[in-house]
Amino acid sequence: MPDAPSLTAIKVIIYDCDGVLIDSRGSNTAFYNHILEKFGLPPLTPRQLDFVQFSTAQAAVDLLFQGSPWREEAQNYQRSIDNRPFLALLRPEPHIREALAALRPAYHTAIATNRGKSLPLVLRELGLAPLFDLTISSYDVTRQKPHPECLLKILEHFRAAAAEAMYIGDAAVDLEASRRAGVIFVAYRNPDLEAYYHLQDHLELLEILPRVSKADK
């Protein structure tokens, strides 16, 4: 990775959702195990859980029911599930609310995620909805990450150039989408990803952005 670029031009901060804004492993485990149990299949393996953390619900069910005669029925079932019982298992990542509050209004804030219909429920449940100017879920694009469509939509909305945006993610699909969109990639709690910056805590972002005053830190 080349030297980190100047951040003086940045005006849009884009976040992934699962694993970055929220800790959703417990919720996702319960959700997909519920579907598997419905069709008499064993619970998620660790490798399957790693996959579903970063995929759309449709891709997750396709993988879990690969070769199964119930795959289409399972897809219909996952689309019909009421997500609300699983929301209680979600946890916001540490200091995310404080970081978002400090970023605004100096920066626009947005979400680009492969999470689908549950995204508005998640943001409302955790009190994060008012802290974002724009959200793009898998339901808002025709091609999900690692395709950059979600990021390109955000750039278009804010009339921003790629050099004026950064994307904070925790997975290889986030890195690939950033590269293809041309935006600066910041890795969250994943030192294995090639990134301009690595964060272990969301408050660390405030230390590298020039338009956040010391009073906000």
Give residue spans per PLM region:
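Asp-based, Mg2+/Mn2+-dependent phosphohydrolase catalytic module
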Residues: 1-11, 101, 116, 120-217
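Secondary-structure boundary/capping positions in well-ordered alpha/beta enzyme cores
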Residues: 42, 67-68, 106-107, 129-130, ...
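Short beta-strand/loop segments at the ligand-binding rim of alpha/beta enzyme cores
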Residues: 108-109, 184
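Conserved phosphate-coupling serine/threonine residues in phosphotransfer and NTP-handling enzymes
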Residues: 113
